[in-house]
Amino acid sequence: MMDYNEFKEGLAEDLINKGFEVGIQPVTKTNGVIEDALYVMGRKASPLIYLPELYEQYEHGADYYEMLSYVSEYMAGYERDSHFRAVRSLSLDDVMRSTQKPIYSMLISRHENEELLKTLPHRDFLDMAQIYYVDLSEFGVQGTAKITNSMAEEFNLTEEELNKISGTNMRFAAKCYDLGDMVLSFGNTDLLTDFLSTGSIPESAGMFVLTNEGTHFGSGLLTQKDLLDRIAEMLGENMYVIPSSIHELILVRADSVPDPEILKGMVHDVNESTVDEKERLTGSVYHYDRNERSLSIACAEYAQDRNLKEFASPDLGREADIERIELDPTDRDRHAAPRRDPAEEYPAFTDQKDQEIGYRQPKRDKGYEQ
């Protein structure tokens, strides 16, 4: 059996021998994860095929030559497939200069992404960071691209403007489902009842999932204060927020949890055993107080160590060490949702500015302002 380096170099060489102009480049993901990816050289936008995922399949018995054949067909399809044609013709200039910019936000861990955050416009949000991305679906591509400092500067967008635009776009993006139903549906949200659409949450729903329509980067919904207030009003009580992943959050009625440390232990265990490292959000548990309209880190010991601060204004500086956020009163895989199967995802795409564009593949046949 080949080791990882032999595998990646051999795959690239075999593809070159088949006539493909490919190279290998490291791609920085969230939480400090760096993965090697195959890409087509000399293209404005190219498929990125992540090699660690392929090697893992190889280690578990997948035939190397069948994998080579699949990657070859995939690369060939890039030249003729209509969806790929949309990707090849995609221009970030068109996206960023459009009248209704498809900009949204997501949350990532501050501690685990210190280096990445140096390259991205962002603001602190408790022990997380709020970053921004563009949704390319309106341009015929099921994908996203993180907004970097250089992109924001090129298109004359400040962090404050990004925050405002994303908040407007995310206003109607939220979906709330029963966790048990979502697990049983294997993530097929077409089969689920959206509590935000019905306007009520049944008592039988002990845990429920907060995400967006595409169940992709849904963690950013935690920044939407009106949304949290609406859900708490539907519950009629306070709630805990479990950071399931960067894609979704799990909400729990506070009265049903005698000690938030129980939830924190659950988060730790699931992060270690189930959630892919690059999709982990944090190890914290958060508490939403319905009466105070505030979101805070639930673990009092952590808050004390970090010098808990309270703010009455939503206009918080990006560099503030914030462990509690007061909302403006005038403004009115087990416990997580099912993980994505890597075989059901497109590789990411990158353009000439080296911006990663991750997008998902259909199954194949076989903010509140701080």
Task: Tell what function each PLM region has.
Residues 1-17, 187, 191-219, 273, ...:
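Terminal alpha-helical anchor/extension segments at protein ends
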Residues 2-23, 31-35, 39-41:
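N-terminal, positively charged regions that mediate nucleic acid binding
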Residues 9, 219-233:
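Short amphipathic alpha-helix segments
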Residues 22-24, 237-241:
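A short linear hydrophobic-aromatic micro-motif
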Residues 24-209:
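Charged, alpha-helical interface segments at or near domain boundaries
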Residues 244-281:
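C-terminal structured domain segments
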Residues 268-306:
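TerminUS-proximal long segments
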Residues 314-370:
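Non-Sec secretion/translocation targeting segments of pathogen effectors
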